[in-house]
A protein has these predicted regions:
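Short, Lys/Arg-enriched N-terminal segments with co-localized hydrophobic residues
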Residues: 1-20
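Consensus positions within tandem repeat domains that build extended binding/scaffold surfaces
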Residues: 36, 60-61, 82-84, 104-107, ...
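Structural signature of tandem-repeat unit edges
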Residues: 5, 21-32, 40-56, 66-79, ...
Length: 182
């Protein structure tokens, strides 16, 4: 006997600036912008709905969601929180929005992708951004990149190439990894 149950898609419930829609809980941060505070799903392919004007993905939003293999982030997002994708070891595809201007520390820590292209508006990689990304081989920085802090690539033992402009200030400790022998 097989019994299955599918939860219906929940409508948006508003309560003092907090909304819930599908697998996401939003919090209003300004007049017309929202922060995604929680993810309660278990999908392999995650799409953050663009029906809300989301500008921030909050700290640890997808942390330890090992089931995630790809994620779509809407073009309204400007900030990615700390430890956002920590432990998403099966994450293979992520396309960052061109609107992205800010990352917090450890954003992609222990994620599973092999390559990432950073948007032009992103000017800085904070410490430990890609810490222990064991599969990471290639990073392409956008034209607006100005600073790569210490330990950004710490523990990225498969890292082969980081492409960035000639005027980027790079910490001497940014590439502490076996792959680049530094």
């Amino acid at each position: 006997l097989l019994i299955s149950y599918e939860e219906p898609i929940e409508p948006i419930i508003e309560n003092q600036g907090v909304k819930r829609m599908q697998d996401f809980i939003y919090s209003q941060i300004e007049d017309c912008t929202y922060c995604v505070m929680r993810y309660r799903g278990n999908e392999a392919e995650v799409v953050i709905p663009d029906s809300q004007n989301v500008t921030v993905l909050f700290d640890r939003l997808f942390a330890r969601h090992k089931e995630i293999t790809s994620i779509h982030i809407p073009d309204t997002v400007t900030d990615l929180g700390e430890l956002l994708f920590d432990g998403c070891e099966n994450l293979r595809h992520i396309e960052l929005p061109s609107s992205l201007t800010s990352l917090w520390g450890y954003t992609f820590c222990r994620s599973g992708f092999e390559e990432i292209v950073l948007p032009d508006k992103l000017a800085c990689l904070p410490p430990f951004t890609f810490k222990d990304c064991k599969n990471l081989k290639r990073v392409v920085c956008g034209s607006g990149m100005k600073k790569i802090h210490a330990w950004v690539f710490g523990g990225c033992d498969q890292l082969e190439e980081v492409v960035c402009g000639p005027n980027v200030e790079i910490s001497p400790d940014a590439y502490k990894t076996k792959a680049l022998n530094t």
